[in-house]
Amino acid sequence: MPTSKQIINKKQDEVSDIYGKEMIRVIRSLLKHKIIDTESLSKKTGYSINTVRRALYTLQKMGIVRYINKEDKTLWQLLETDYEKILDTLLEPYKKEEKAETGELLFICPKCGRKYTLDEAEMYEFRCPEDGTLLVANQ
């Protein structure tokens, strides 16, 4: 059974493949600072301002960050502080697309709302690894 760290690493690799490796570094910097301006984030990540903005706009569309205008400065505020949930949010549109293509059955934890593939559900013996609740099939 894969460890939580292995699962996160796999999700992180998938996010990097889809959005680029800069997305991971931007997210990690946001997790450290919670509220930060674009220029500072650019310096902290080592990426150009345009690259950072592209990542931020993607995160904004997904509801992970929001911008705040304060005294002629745009600040970005992280709305979700759980790294794995951020990765899940970024991967969700692709997982849904993949599910539609393959007809794969998904399982959901009715308590926390996390989604699992059949393989993951089997791996966790159809119990949510976060809270132990029995997973239900999503149709």
Curated annotation (Swiss-Prot):
It comes from Nanoarchaeum equitans (strain Kin4-M). This is Transcription factor E. The keyword Transcription applies. HAMAP family: TFE_arch. PROSITE patterns: HTH_TFE_IIE (PS51344). One of its GO terms (molecular function) is DNA binding. Coiled coil: none annotated. SUPFAM superfamilies: Winged helix' DNA-binding domain. Transcription factor that plays a role in the activation of archaeal genes transcribed by RNA polymerase. Facilitates transcription initiation by enhancing TATA-box recognition by TATA-box-binding protein (Tbp), and transcription factor B (Tfb) and RNA polymerase recruitment. Not absolutely required for transcription in vitro, but particularly important in cases where Tbp or Tfb function is not optimal. It dynamically alters the nucleic acid-binding properties of RNA polymerases by stabilizing the initiation complex and destabilizing elongation complexes. The winged helix domain is involved in binding to DNA in the preinitiation complex. Belongs to the TFE family. It comes from the Archaea. Keywords: DNA-binding, Transcription, Transcription regulation. The gene is tfe. Monomer. Interaction with RNA polymerase subunits RpoF and RpoE is necessary for Tfe stimulatory transcription activity. Able to interact with Tbp and RNA polymerase in the absence of DNA promoter. Interacts both with the preinitiation and elongation complexes. Pfam families: TFIIE_alpha. One of its GO terms (biological process) is transcription initiation at RNA polymerase II promoter. Residues 7-91 form the HTH TFE/IIEalpha-type domain.
